């Protein structure tokens, strides 16, 4: 396999000769992303260099998890993996579909017309139905992780934080504005409904053109939520596992909930109704992705015969393993060796 090496944004970028016209798109904490032209498929693609994938055992596990998720999760509303390889410098490169922009960039320009918000929300929930049916929680759903092309096709990306639903889970995940209250309150026990809360926040932001709960820190974030929803009900407070957090919540001044109709007076009744069933303190009372797809607001797009669930659960057996870096590297090589370019 022949590799071509270039310096891009101060980073060595190595690709196989299959990929031409490599141009930088963005640089983040976990990787450099470039656009390129795939000379075999004759399609434009995104090539992501994963930075220091084996820097330590924790990062190696995160890298392995993201690769496994991209390989197994195949759906029209999830970013599709086309190729994967390890370069001569032992960096990992992921090749995925290339979409022109993301929802975050669109929202920085202006609010969306209702018809676009409707279509994007349908696709978000369609993707979440599939993810959740595979036993996966995204945990970091936000506008910048929702890629969009010129046809308004939407694809969920960035599965670096995705996890299995477990009894105990870490508290600091997801970008603050879209973070479900149970993450802030209980810190450890939560499930797939954190993604549903995030989707509700994104729907409100699409129509308003600005975040619904733009907290400066997690305490301010929680305060902004109570300004709309009121104090958390007793059944939610009882689920808080931290005694300190429970005392703080119980000491809050009484805050009556505001009707969402008063908060979003410019929205139509159907979207208010959907938001009321997504943005609930109690995750057990929120609509699932599958039931939300049946809501009247999404009726123009809902098709139960074209909203597939995963055929099998994702295998999380590796997730609790405490393995040395060399073992993760070997497992990664095995995974990459069996990677195929498969259509969604």
UniProtKB/Swiss-Prot annotation:
Give, as one word, the top-level EC class: transferase
PTM sites of type Phosphothreonine: 170
Q: What is its EC number?
A: 2.7.11.24
For this protein, the record's Pfam families field holds: Pkinase (PF00069)
Regulation of activity: Activated by tyrosine and threonine phosphorylation.
SMART domains given in the database record: S_TKc (SM00220)
Q: Where does ATP bind?
A: 25-33, 48
The UniProt keywords, alphabetically, are: ATP-binding, Kinase, Nucleotide-binding, Phosphoprotein, Serine/threonine-protein kinase, Transferase
Catalyzed chemical reaction(s): L-seryl-[protein] + ATP = O-phospho-L-seryl-[protein] + ADP + H(+); L-threonyl-[protein] + ATP = O-phospho-L-threonyl-[protein] + ADP + H(+)
Mark the residues carrying the PTM Phosphotyrosine.
172
User: PTM comment for this protein?
Assistant: Dually phosphorylated on Thr-170 and Tyr-172, which activates the enzyme.
**GO molecular function terms listed in the Swiss-Prot or TrEMBL record:** ATP binding; MAP kinase activity; protein serine kinase activity
**Locus of motif TXY:** 170-172
Q: Look up the record and name the cofactor or cofactors this protein needs.
A: Mg(2+)
- The residue ranges of the Protein kinase domain are 19-298
Active site, per annotation: 140 (proton acceptor)
Q: Domain note for this entry?
A: The TXY motif contains the threonine and tyrosine residues whose phosphorylation activates the MAP kinases.
Role description? Mitogen-activated protein kinase required for growth on media where sorbitol or mannitol is the sole carbon source.
Q: Report the family membership.
A: Belongs to the protein kinase superfamily. Ser/Thr protein kinase family. MAP kinase subfamily. HOG1 sub-subfamily.
Instruction: Give the protein name, as stated in the record.
Output: Mitogen-activated protein kinase mpkC
Species of origin: Aspergillus oryzae (strain ATCC 42149 / RIB 40) (Yellow koji mold)
Gene name, per UniProt, is mpkC
